Amino acid sequence: MKTLSQAQSKTSSQQFSFTGNSSANVIIGNQKLTINDVARVARNGTLVSLTNNTDILQGIQASCDYINNAVESGEPIYGVTSGFGGMANVAISREQASELQTNLVWFLKTGAGNKLPLADVRAAMLLRANSHMRGASGIRLELIKRMEIFLNAGVTPYVYEFGSIGASGDLVPLSYITGSLIGLDPSFKVDFNGKEMDAPTALRQLNLSPLTLLPKEGLAMMNGTSVMTGIAANCVYDTQILTAIAMGVHALDIQALNGTNQSFHPFIHNSKPHPGQLWAADQMISLLANSQLVRDELDGKHDYRDHELIQDRYSLRCLPQYLGPIVDGISQIAKQIEIEINSVTDNPLIDVDNQASYHGGNFLGQYVGMGMDHLRYYIGLLAKHLDVQIALLASPEFSNGLPPSLLGNRERKVNMGLKGLQICGNSIMPLLTFYGNSIADRFPTHAEQFNQNINSQGYTSATLARRSVDIFQNYVAIALMFGVQAVDLRTYKKTGHYDARACLSPATERLYSAVRHVVGQKPTSDRPYIWNDNEQGLDEHIARISADIAAGGVIVQAVQDILPCLH
């Protein structure tokens, strides 16, 4: 097994291992792909196979034949027998038709900034192949198969974070994939199972020869939304995981704050039956079931709480109403991204049944742009909610008797508890809400001679979403650390020992134990998670927890009961 290099990217949530496991191939061409399919290929190196369905393969060839006939007859078709964009009034001869496609790669090779994570580029190749298998693009099966070969061999072109306005698709990013697939020039670089090399060398190692693009093929490869959609699919997948973990954190916090389960009673939420609200309430009932730390008041009875409020504060009591629209929103985004995953997004499109071609705009990434704007907004709301819970836990005035800043050893007077950890979290949360600002509605770019005179900024929105997801991953790690320390301290207050496993609900005990395992601390009865400040570096714990989440490790496995509903 070889691990594909992440040297070109700082985004930890995009790590993946190339396993080459063929037992559950993802088939391209005869079935719709899901976000989970994209994650399997992009992250885990699951092998892909082009369908051998005869009708589909014949349709691909028929679209190529249509283009060839159009070139031979001189029929005016955009980007085939004409120039591009604002120069589409330039007629291209039969002799120049192939050169036009190769030149397209060259003049679009203008990317800048950091390299994209490998997993996002792998997702893009998968989606480009999936789009072309519809037989409406006029591209050879041989070129589509190159993407299958690259994916299965762990060969990933380097693509850059700047270059696309999401108008005519991801022209600049896809030029790097195209140039690498055909071995156009040594300046096109790839990652070959962790080793950087130029594209022609990679082709030789794969026993492949350089390809010359035929008419329409360059445009078909570069004129589409596959890169922004690949990034978006990975971001939605990550956000679903982080939402599930956040639900687990809230369940830990409710137990640590000695909260009630009454606020999640079905009677309340059936009276306001938004799907996300119903889901959140039902999940919280399950997450808190059989806990010894929660107030079990599902019978509708109420008890006075000494000097505390008779009902929980809003961040606990209104959890379903707050999280419900976020869950619904993420679900809607996922549906839109899956439609985009299974769409044909280049131009023109070829209708082989009616021997016609149509000039259109499926390359405009507006659904992706707006979807990723909304996803970042929802991530900011998720962080805001967790931040409020952390503030309750850290403040003895509101924590129902927990020590200030969740101090462990109060006899050591210099201990400050999780004060620094909260400050770090406070530095992250505003940034996440800032990233929640939209970009699809901003900065109109009257690009390319006013041909691309409206754009989606879908690619930029998606890359911002990637950044937001990676930052939120660190914030969730901090929230988990607060939750684990808090339930240890609540357990001590209730039982006289610190091992929260004895008191937690079974569902949250799994999450608690997973975090303890990841940070390398077994629970004990005589000490909570954090005892003295100088006995561990909490920055290392943040990094370990974040890395485990990124790798789909034991923390993610601990919330598997929640994930199917979100996926």
Swiss-Prot record:
Modification 2,3-didehydroalanine (Ser), positions: 168
Catalyzed reaction equations: L-phenylalanine = (E)-cinnamate + NH4(+)
Recorded effect of pH on activity: Optimum pH is 7.7-8.5.
Biological process according to GO: aromatic amino acid metabolic process; cinnamic acid biosynthetic process; L-phenylalanine catabolic process; phenylpropanoid biosynthetic process; protein homotetramerization
Effect of residue 565 to S: Prevents formation of artifactual disulfide bonds and increases solubility
EC number(s) from the headed UniProt entry: 4.3.1.24
Outcome after substituting residue 108 to G: Decreases catalytic rate
Enzyme class name: lyase
Subcellular location as annotated: Cytoplasm
Crosslink feature (5-imidazolinone (Ala-Gly)) location: 167-169
PTM: Contains an active site 4-methylidene-imidazol-5-one (MIO), which is formed autocatalytically by cyclization and dehydration of residues Ala-Ser-Gly.
Protein residues bound to (E)-cinnamate: 223, 311, 317, 347, 419, 448, 451
PROSITE patterns: PAL_HISTIDASE (PS00488)
Keyword tags: Cytoplasm, Lyase, Phenylalanine catabolism, Phenylpropanoid metabolism
Molecular function GO terms recorded: phenylalanine ammonia-lyase activity
GO CC term (a single one): cytoplasm
Pfam families found in the cross-reference section: Lyase_aromatic
Pathway: Phenylpropanoid metabolism; trans-cinnamate biosynthesis; trans-cinnamate from L-phenylalanine: step 1/1
Superkingdom classification of source: Bacteria
Active site: 78
Job description of the protein: Catalyzes the non-oxidative deamination of L-phenylalanine to form trans-cinnamic acid, the first step in the phenylpropanoid pathway.
Assembly, per entry: Homotetramer.
Family statement drawn from the similarity comment of this UniProt entry: Belongs to the PAL/histidase family.
Record-given protein name: Phenylalanine ammonia-lyase
Native source organism of the sequence: Trichormus variabilis (strain ATCC 29413 / PCC 7937) (Anabaena variabilis)
